Design a protein with these regions (language model features):
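C-terminal alpha-helix
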Residues: 8, 182-190
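FAD-binding beta-loop-beta segment adjacent to the flavin cofactor pocket
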Residues: 96, 129-162
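Catalytic phosphate/metal-binding cores of nucleic-acid and nucleotide-processing enzymes, i.e., regions
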Residues: 164-168, 180-181, 185
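A helicase ATPase "motif cassette" and its flanking acidic/Ser/Thr-rich regulatory loops
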Residues: 176
Length: 192
C-alpha cells in the first residue's frame, strides 16, 4: 500500500512519531510535496503532563501515583491460566493486559476505548477486567475526553459539542494537530 501511495503521488513519505510533540507514540507516514520537512523538535511531553487530576471508583489510579499502560482484550483462558484462543469450548473473558514499558508515553489512540487504559496493577495479564465472572472490576480507568484531546494536541474542550463516545472515536481517527502544523509550517512563503 505504501508503494502505491508513493507511486501515485510521486513523493516519498516522511515517518513522524507524534511522541515528539505529544504524550503518545503514534508513528505515521506523511506524503507531502512541501519541501524540506524535517522531524519536529522533541518537546519532552510525558503522560503525566496531560493526565487530569480525577477521583473515581479506584482511587489508587490517580495522577501522581505510578500508573501502567494497559489494554483490555478478549481471551480464552483455560483452568491453568493459559491462553487457548482456538478452543471454542472456553468462554471469552476480557483480560487487562498490562504492558511492560519504560516509556512515559501513551500507546497510539484508536477508535476503541479499551485499547488504552491506565492501571496501578503490575505487568502481566489480569483476568476478568470488568468483573463479569468474579463480581469485582479490576482497578483501571479509561482516558478522559480531555486526555484524548491533549494526546492529539487539540485545544482543551475542542470536542465538547459532541457526545463523549463520538468525540473519542473522531479523535482516535484523527491526526496529531501539532504534527500537521509542523508539516504546514514548511510551506515556502513567496513575496508577490
Amino acid at each position: 500500500m505504501k508503494q502505491i501511495f508513493t507511486d501515485t503521488l510521486g513523493v516519498e513519505p516522511i515517518l513522524i512519531n507524534s511522541s515528539l510533540v505529544s504524550a503518545q507514540n503514534r508513528n505515521r507516514l506523511y506524503w507531502t510535496n512541501i519541501p524540506n520537512v524535517t522531524q519536529p523538535e522533541d518537546r519532552h511531553i510525558g503522560l503525566n503532563d496531560i493526565l487530569e487530576d480525577i477521583s473515581f471508583e479506584h482511587p489508587a489510579a490517580v495522577r501522581g501515583r505510578p500508573l501502567n499502560k494497559a489494554t483490555i482484550v478478549g481471551r480464552r483462558i483455560n483452568e491453568h491460566g493459559h491462553r487457548e484462543d482456538y478452543n471454542h469450548d472456553i468462554k471469552i473473558v476480557q483480560c487487562l493486559e498490562v504492558r511492560k514499558s519504560n516509556t512515559d508515553k501513551s500507546n497510539c489512540l484508536t477508535t476503541v476505548e479499551k485499547d488504552n487504559v491506565l492501571t496501578p496493577l503490575p505487568f502481566g495479564r489480569h483476568v476478568d477486567a470488568f468483573g463479569m465472572y468474579c463480581g469485582n472490576r479490576l482497578p483501571f480507568r479509561f482516558y478522559t475526553r480531555l486526555e484524548y484531546e491533549r494526546l492529539q494536541t487539540l485545544p482543551d474542550g475542542y470536542t465538547n459539542a459532541a457526545n463523549e463516545t463520538k468525540a473519542k472515536k473522531a479523535i482516535g481517527n484523527g491526526w496529531t494537530v501539532d504534527v500537521i502544523a509542523h508539516i504546514l509550517s514548511h510551506i515556502p512563503i513567496h513575496d508577490s
